[in-house]
């Protein structure tokens, strides 16, 4: 009798178990369907709003074809040498909005959007500094912007302009490095800082994954900046191609700096000024801690000093009151420094 009861109880539990499993299956299928629906809605929202933004805010410069792709170039002013502005990682010509109009008062000045950034088409080539220099050379040539040039590079743009000068030395007569990255910085940073660097890489990858579905756009995580250019920043920095390019640029720089792939030589006696951020303003996030931030600032300062020795006429200036974006925090200093180098480069150009 007890055996019969046990068998009957087990038989009764099996249908209940199947019903529970069936309802769990329905629930999971419903959740999967909801996720798919949200993804479709998000992707549609991203596509429509991206198109609307680009129609509303057109680029101020010209779209020049380079190797079958359109690259945005914005030139103003007259005179020689022409100042070429190279932006930092993921940045576009708008990072120079406070300095370009003033520079145009004493010479010709051009900013541009690298491939996949701003209003420029994305390109299949990896964003190595050598490829970026090659694209810039083609852009300037196709647009009829003749050398000589004074190259100005911010952050990772500092490495790009050094590589450009190394590839096309006769084109360049002066250089300004604005809180420039250093080719060896990943190896020279304090080792505990690399944990934060890896977290930043993860952040860029999450943004890249979320952007095609409109998440950063919807929650307001893209296109933040000074109010006078915020709408234009939102137009370009909420684009899917921007998130993909930013991630690719960071990955490439991390690998190149870690492996020592980006090697360039001396600038000889070329006019050179290195502008560095104010250590008291902090170029590193609070999240890494006070002690590590101090160690990182010391390492950064040493690397900035190294950059100033690239030329026998090199000079380093610490931008008081400025963080990493010196051209935003201290546009006056950036303008005066570029003016100084332009004047010095005119004499240098005659001698070379």
Show which residues each predicted segment covers.
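Flexible "cap/lid" loop of the alpha/beta hydrolase fold
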Residues: 176-208
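Conserved serine/cysteine hydrolase catalytic core
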Residues: 225-318
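Active-site loop/oxyanion-hole signature of alpha/beta-hydrolase fold enzymes
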Residues: 74-76, 114-152, 168
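Alpha/beta-hydrolase
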Residues: 85-86, 112-114, 178, 276, ...
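Catalytic active-site module of serine/aspartate enzymes centered on a nucleophile-bearing elbow/loop
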Residues: 310-352
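Alpha/beta-hydrolase fold catalytic core
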Residues: 2-81, 105-107, 126, 224, ...
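Conserved hydrolase catalytic core segment
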Residues: 146-189
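Conserved HGGG/HGGXW glycine-rich cap/lid loop of the alpha/beta-hydrolase fold
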Residues: 69-119
């Amino acid at each position: 009798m007890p055996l019969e009861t046990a068998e009957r109880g087990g038989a009764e539990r099996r249908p209940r178990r199947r019903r529970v499993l069936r309802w769990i299956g329905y629930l999971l299928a419903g959740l999967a369907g909801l996720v798919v629906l949200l993804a479709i809605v998000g992707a549609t929202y991203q596509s429509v709003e991206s198109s609307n933004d680009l129609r509303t805010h057109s680029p101020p410069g010209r779209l020049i074809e380079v190797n079958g792709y359109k690259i945005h170039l914005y030139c103003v002013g007259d005179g020689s040498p022409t100042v070429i502005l190279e932006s930092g990682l993921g940045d576009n010509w708008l990072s120079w909005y406070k300095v370009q109009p003033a520079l145009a008062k004493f010479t010709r000045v051009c900013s541009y959007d690298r491939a996949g950034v701003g209003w420029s088409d994305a390109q299949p080539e990896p964003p190595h500094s050598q490829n970026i220099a090659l694209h810039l050379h083609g852009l300037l040539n196709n647009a009829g912007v003749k050398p000589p040039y004074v190259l100005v590079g911010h952050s990772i743009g500092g490495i790009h302009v050094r590589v450009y000068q190394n590839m096309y030395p006769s084109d360049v007569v002066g250089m300004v490095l604005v809180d420039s990255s250093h080719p060896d910085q990943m190896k020279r940073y304090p080792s505990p800082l690399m944990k934060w660097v890896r977290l930043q890489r993860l952040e860029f990858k999450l943004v890249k994954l979320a952007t095609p579905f409109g998440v950063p756009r919807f929650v307001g995580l893209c296109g933040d900046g000074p109010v006078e250019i915020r709408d234009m920043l939102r137009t370009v920095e909420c684009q899917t191609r921007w998130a993909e390019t930013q991630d690719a640029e960071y990955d490439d720089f991390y690998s190149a700096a870690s492996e020592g792939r980006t090697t360039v030589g001396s600038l000889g006696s070329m006019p050179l000024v290195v502008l560095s951020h104010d250590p008291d303003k902090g170029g590193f996030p609070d999240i890494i801690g006070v002690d590590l931030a101090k160690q990182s600032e010391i390492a950064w300062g040493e690397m900035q000093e190294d950059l100033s020795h690239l030329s026998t006429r090199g000079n380093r200036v610490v931008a008081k009151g400025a963080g990493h974006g010196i051209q935003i925090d201290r546009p006056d200093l950036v303008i005066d420094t570029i003016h100084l180098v332009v004047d010095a480069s005119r004499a240098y150009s005659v001698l070379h």
